[in-house]
Amino acid sequence: MSDRSSRRERITKETSVRVEIDLDGNGNSEINTGIGFLDHMLTLFSFNSKVNLDVFAKGDSYVCDHHTIEDIGITLGEAFKESLGDKHGINRYGTFYVPMDETLALASIDVSNRPFLVFDCDFKREKVGEMSTEMVVEFFRAFAFNAGITLHLKVLYGENDHHKIEALFKAFGRAIKEAISRSSDNDIPSTKGSL
């Protein structure tokens, strides 16, 4: 693992989550959350960001998927923030559009230590696979606030909910890749001198 890597665990009465992340990877992943569609989305994120990612989770799925998905977002966000360290030499910003058939999605990121989420997407279905569509925004909110990033996600247009969610995760991965890439200098990318 590189110097930009982290391992985080979160154990509560509702869930047990373990995340390993290496920002300087090649997109390898091993994902087992107990929620097949989320596994697919996290695999796509890893591949598109080129971040190596292992996620193992067990949760109270007999209740619903909320606790598991939110806790994965929290733990992944914490690991991401820890992996970045003091943020010397990163680009800081990343923006990417991804088309998927009839859908076009946008992700824009500022690794600013100013957590915020703007999420603009409507879903027609209650679930895609075993994953509640209402949990898409909850995952990204948990990630953004624990990673300390400003994250804007928008589906500009589209019909199929699977395509919308997949395009969002791919765009998110590509924007992360751009934001965490090393710039030509080793400065902190802020006039304040810190992030």
Swiss-Prot record:
E.C. designation(s): 4.2.1.19
Protein keywords: Amino-acid biosynthesis, Cytoplasm, Histidine biosynthesis, Lyase
Pathway(s): Amino-acid biosynthesis; L-histidine biosynthesis; L-histidine from 5-phospho-alpha-D-ribose 1-diphosphate: step 6/9
Subcellular location: Cytoplasm
GO molecular function, one term: imidazoleglycerol-phosphate dehydratase activity
Cell cycle found in the keyword field: no
PROSITE patterns: IGP_DEHYDRATASE_2 (PS00955)
Swiss-Prot/TrEMBL GO biological process terms: L-histidine biosynthetic process
GO cellular component annotations of the record: cytoplasm
Protein name as it appears in the record: Imidazoleglycerol-phosphate dehydratase
Organism for this UniProt entry: Clostridium beijerinckii (strain ATCC 51743 / NCIMB 8052) (Clostridium acetobutylicum)
